[in-house]
A protein has these predicted regions:
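Glycine/serine-rich anion-binding loops at beta->alpha junctions
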Residues: 49-87
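Extended polybasic, low-complexity segments that bind anionic RNA or targeting/receptor surfaces
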Residues: 1-43, 88-208
Protein backbone atom coordinates (compact mmCIF):
# COMPACT_ATOMS: atom_id res chain seq x y z
CA UNK A 1 0.00 0.00 0.00
CA UNK A 2 1.44 3.37 -1.04
CA UNK A 3 2.24 5.92 1.65
CA UNK A 4 0.19 9.06 1.26
CA UNK A 5 -0.17 12.46 2.91
CA UNK A 6 -3.13 14.83 2.72
CA UNK A 7 -2.97 17.81 0.40
CA UNK A 8 -3.76 20.44 3.02
CA UNK A 9 -5.89 23.22 1.62
CA UNK A 10 -6.39 21.31 -1.62
CA UNK A 11 -7.91 18.08 -2.85
CA UNK A 12 -6.73 14.51 -2.78
CA UNK A 13 -3.52 13.13 -1.37
CA UNK A 14 0.17 13.19 -2.22
CA UNK A 15 2.06 9.93 -2.61
CA UNK A 16 5.14 9.68 -0.41
CA UNK A 17 8.26 7.84 -1.46
CA UNK A 18 8.77 4.54 0.33
CA UNK A 19 12.55 5.06 0.45
CA UNK A 20 12.10 8.20 2.55
CA UNK A 21 8.89 7.69 4.51
CA UNK A 22 8.87 3.91 4.87
CA UNK A 23 12.11 3.42 6.79
CA UNK A 24 12.05 1.26 9.91
CA UNK A 25 13.00 3.54 12.84
CA UNK A 26 15.88 2.66 15.15
CA UNK A 27 15.77 4.39 18.50
CA UNK A 28 19.50 4.19 19.17
CA UNK A 29 20.37 5.97 15.91
CA UNK A 30 17.74 8.66 16.45
CA UNK A 31 19.04 9.25 19.97
CA UNK A 32 22.62 9.52 18.73
CA UNK A 33 21.74 12.11 16.10
CA UNK A 34 19.57 14.21 18.43
CA UNK A 35 22.39 14.19 20.96
CA UNK A 36 24.84 15.28 18.25
CA UNK A 37 22.57 18.16 17.17
CA UNK A 38 22.11 19.36 20.74
CA UNK A 39 25.82 19.12 21.50
CA UNK A 40 26.73 21.05 18.36
CA UNK A 41 24.50 23.93 19.42
CA UNK A 42 26.40 24.45 22.67
CA UNK A 43 28.56 27.55 22.54
CA UNK A 44 31.27 26.16 24.79
CA UNK A 45 32.33 29.66 25.88
CA UNK A 46 32.49 28.83 29.60
CA UNK A 47 35.81 29.77 31.17
CA UNK A 48 37.48 29.96 34.57
CA UNK A 49 40.84 31.43 35.49
CA UNK A 50 43.71 29.31 36.70
CA UNK A 51 46.14 30.51 39.38
CA UNK A 52 48.35 31.83 36.62
CA UNK A 53 45.57 34.01 35.19
CA UNK A 54 44.02 35.67 38.25
CA UNK A 55 45.23 39.13 39.26
CA UNK A 56 47.32 39.84 42.34
CA UNK A 57 48.91 37.40 44.75
CA UNK A 58 52.49 38.28 43.97
CA UNK A 59 53.58 38.78 47.58
CA UNK A 60 54.06 35.88 49.97
CA UNK A 61 51.14 36.15 52.47
CA UNK A 62 53.27 35.41 55.56
CA UNK A 63 56.74 34.24 56.41
CA UNK A 64 57.86 30.73 55.67
CA UNK A 65 58.54 29.56 59.22
CA UNK A 66 57.47 30.25 62.74
CA UNK A 67 53.74 30.77 62.30
CA UNK A 68 52.62 27.17 62.77
CA UNK A 69 50.65 27.41 59.58
CA UNK A 70 51.21 25.60 56.33
CA UNK A 71 53.62 27.42 54.07
CA UNK A 72 52.05 29.55 51.35
CA UNK A 73 53.66 31.38 48.46
CA UNK A 74 50.66 33.23 47.05
CA UNK A 75 47.06 34.06 47.90
CA UNK A 76 45.98 33.17 44.40
CA UNK A 77 46.25 29.42 44.91
CA UNK A 78 43.01 27.45 44.69
CA UNK A 79 42.56 27.13 48.48
CA UNK A 80 42.24 30.92 48.91
CA UNK A 81 39.16 33.02 48.22
CA UNK A 82 39.79 34.88 44.98
CA UNK A 83 42.31 32.29 43.90
CA UNK A 84 42.42 30.35 40.68
CA UNK A 85 40.29 27.33 39.87
CA UNK A 86 41.79 23.87 39.53
CA UNK A 87 40.55 21.88 36.53
CA UNK A 88 37.77 24.40 35.91
CA UNK A 89 35.83 24.57 32.63
CA UNK A 90 37.68 26.06 29.68
CA UNK A 91 36.38 27.11 26.25
CA UNK A 92 35.87 24.06 24.07
CA UNK A 93 33.79 22.69 21.24
CA UNK A 94 31.09 20.17 22.10
CA UNK A 95 30.47 19.24 18.47
CA UNK A 96 30.06 15.51 17.91
CA UNK A 97 31.15 14.12 14.58
CA UNK A 98 28.57 11.87 12.98
CA UNK A 99 28.57 9.82 9.84
CA UNK A 100 26.74 11.75 7.12
CA UNK A 101 24.94 8.71 5.74
CA UNK A 102 23.83 7.75 9.24
CA UNK A 103 22.50 11.27 9.82
CA UNK A 104 20.48 11.24 6.61
CA UNK A 105 19.13 7.82 7.49
CA UNK A 106 18.08 9.07 10.92
CA UNK A 107 16.27 11.97 9.28
CA UNK A 108 14.39 9.54 7.03
CA UNK A 109 13.51 7.48 10.11
CA UNK A 110 12.09 10.55 11.82
CA UNK A 111 10.05 11.43 8.73
CA UNK A 112 8.82 7.84 8.57
CA UNK A 113 7.46 8.13 12.11
CA UNK A 114 5.30 11.06 10.98
CA UNK A 115 4.14 9.17 7.91
CA UNK A 116 3.20 6.16 10.03
CA UNK A 117 1.19 8.32 12.43
CA UNK A 118 -0.53 10.33 9.65
CA UNK A 119 0.87 13.57 11.05
CA UNK A 120 2.50 14.88 7.87
CA UNK A 121 0.77 17.05 5.29
CA UNK A 122 1.63 18.93 2.10
CA UNK A 123 0.41 22.38 1.07
CA UNK A 124 0.96 24.24 -2.18
CA UNK A 125 3.07 26.93 -0.51
CA UNK A 126 1.48 29.71 -2.56
CA UNK A 127 0.67 32.63 -0.27
CA UNK A 128 -0.19 35.84 -2.07
CA UNK A 129 0.95 37.93 0.88
CA UNK A 130 2.17 37.34 4.43
CA UNK A 131 -1.04 36.78 6.39
CA UNK A 132 -1.07 34.89 9.66
CA UNK A 133 -4.83 34.39 9.44
CA UNK A 134 -4.34 32.46 6.19
CA UNK A 135 -1.89 30.16 7.95
CA UNK A 136 -4.35 29.67 10.83
CA UNK A 137 -7.13 28.82 8.38
CA UNK A 138 -4.91 26.31 6.60
CA UNK A 139 -4.00 24.54 9.85
CA UNK A 140 -7.65 24.56 10.95
CA UNK A 141 -8.56 22.58 7.82
CA UNK A 142 -5.90 20.02 8.63
CA UNK A 143 -6.98 19.55 12.27
CA UNK A 144 -3.60 18.48 13.54
CA UNK A 145 -2.01 19.09 16.92
CA UNK A 146 0.91 21.37 17.66
CA UNK A 147 3.90 21.73 18.06
CA UNK A 148 4.04 22.18 14.31
CA UNK A 149 7.07 22.33 12.02
CA UNK A 150 6.53 23.97 8.63
CA UNK A 151 9.11 23.05 5.98
CA UNK A 152 9.53 25.62 3.22
CA UNK A 153 11.97 26.36 0.41
CA UNK A 154 12.71 30.03 1.05
CA UNK A 155 12.84 31.64 4.49
CA UNK A 156 11.88 34.98 2.95
CA UNK A 157 8.71 33.97 1.12
CA UNK A 158 5.15 34.85 2.15
CA UNK A 159 4.47 31.41 3.64
CA UNK A 160 7.38 31.78 6.05
CA UNK A 161 6.12 35.13 7.31
CA UNK A 162 2.58 33.77 7.59
CA UNK A 163 3.48 30.81 9.80
CA UNK A 164 6.27 32.19 11.96
CA UNK A 165 3.99 34.15 14.32
CA UNK A 166 1.93 31.13 15.29
CA UNK A 167 2.49 29.76 18.81
CA UNK A 168 4.18 26.38 19.07
CA UNK A 169 5.13 26.57 15.41
CA UNK A 170 8.59 26.57 13.85
CA UNK A 171 9.34 27.47 10.23
CA UNK A 172 12.41 25.78 8.76
CA UNK A 173 13.95 25.51 5.34
CA UNK A 174 14.94 22.08 4.07
CA UNK A 175 18.58 22.77 4.93
CA UNK A 176 17.61 23.66 8.51
CA UNK A 177 15.40 20.62 9.03
CA UNK A 178 17.05 18.36 11.59
CA UNK A 179 16.21 15.12 13.36
CA UNK A 180 15.41 16.82 16.65
CA UNK A 181 12.99 19.28 15.03
CA UNK A 182 11.16 16.47 13.24
CA UNK A 183 10.82 14.43 16.44
CA UNK A 184 9.82 17.51 18.46
CA UNK A 185 6.93 18.26 16.13
CA UNK A 186 3.60 16.54 16.58
CA UNK A 187 2.73 17.61 13.03
CA UNK A 188 4.87 18.26 9.96
CA UNK A 189 3.63 20.51 7.15
CA UNK A 190 5.71 20.55 3.95
CA UNK A 191 5.46 23.19 1.25
CA UNK A 192 4.96 21.88 -2.25
CA UNK A 193 7.34 24.58 -3.51
CA UNK A 194 10.29 22.80 -1.94
CA UNK A 195 12.55 21.50 -4.76
CA UNK A 196 11.64 18.00 -5.87
CA UNK A 197 8.41 16.06 -6.14
CA UNK A 198 5.84 17.39 -3.64
CA UNK A 199 5.91 15.41 -0.46
CA UNK A 200 8.87 13.22 -1.36
CA UNK A 201 11.49 15.08 0.70
CA UNK A 202 14.16 13.04 -1.05
CA UNK A 203 15.67 16.45 -1.60
CA UNK A 204 16.59 16.86 2.04
CA UNK A 205 19.83 17.94 0.40
CA UNK A 206 21.31 14.47 0.20
CA UNK A 207 23.37 15.58 -2.78
CA UNK A 208 25.40 17.98 -0.66
Amino acid sequence: MALQAPNVGGKGKVTLQEAVFGVEPRESLLHEMVRAEQASRRQGTHATKTRGEVAGGRAKPFRQKGTGRARQGTTRAAQFAGGGVVFGPQPRSYAVKVNRKAYLKARRMALSLHAASDSIGVFDGAFDAPRTKDAIALIAKWRQDRPLVVVIDDAEDAAAYSFRNLPKSVVLTVDELGVEAILWARSLLVSGSVPGAPGSLVYVREDR
